[in-house]
């Protein structure tokens, strides 16, 4: 990988991991335009680690509070808002794990094409618009409850389909279930931690077993750039949606999907 490819792909990963705009849709464009080969598992792990570090550091106070409360709920039987939120995030992760292990190969075989990505980018963008329009804006993430958390987790499992956007579909589900915009985004971001960590661990296992060649310079640069982009993305996204809602991202998704359709089929 040359330096330009590392920079572009790392920034795309960092920005699109948490924006509701689909990383898959953005990653196919530079590959098609510049004729780049697959960046490899090692680079994927590096940029995922950068994104993971960004969300963990940004929400470090909330994560520490949840971890302490979660341990207290296990060993002392003490329940609190933080311990409940931790349990709900764990519960919301289960559907993605189940679907990931059972349907990953099928999705890779039948739903990985650029046409699917273009269409799902538009469809799930419209669904996000609908959710934002009907959102009741009532609850914080601490009022979610286990049933709503599980439903958001089921929605997260749909993100296995390329073009869906993990953050987009989970925020959509959370809005439909009554969470405030900022609360929906925060819950989605906290949900991403076990998912990104799990994906990175699985890819690391494949790297070890398949003896991949590692370009440490590309990995270090990719990880750092992904971290910076992801952290900035989280910060500004939470501020934007509090004032403007999801409309800018819906418009962008639809425009991108239409452009991809034209790029692919015309």
Swiss-Prot record:
Keyword Cell inner membrane annotated: yes
Family annotation (InterPro entries): UppP
GO CC, alphabetical: plasma membrane
Chief location of this protein within or outside the cell: membrane
Biological process according to GO: cell wall organization; peptidoglycan biosynthetic process; regulation of cell shape; response to antibiotic
Secretion signal, residue range per the UniProt entry: none
Catalytic function, reaction form: di-trans,octa-cis-undecaprenyl diphosphate + H2O = di-trans,octa-cis-undecaprenyl phosphate + phosphate + H(+)
Broad enzyme group: hydrolase
Membrane topology: Multi-pass membrane protein
Xref: Pfam families: BacA
UniProt KW keywords: Antibiotic resistance, Cell inner membrane, Cell membrane, Cell shape, Cell wall biogenesis/degradation, Hydrolase, Membrane, Peptidoglycan synthesis, Transmembrane, Transmembrane helix
The enzyme's E.C. designation: 3.6.1.27
TM region positions: 1-21, 39-59, 83-103, 111-131, 149-169, 183-203, 218-238, 246-266
Additional remark text: Bacitracin is thought to be involved in the inhibition of peptidoglycan synthesis by sequestering undecaprenyl diphosphate, thereby reducing the pool of lipid carrier available.
Family under the similarity heading: Belongs to the UppP family.
Database matches in NCBIfam families: PRK00281.2-4, undec_PP_bacA
Name by which UniProt lists this protein: Undecaprenyl-diphosphatase
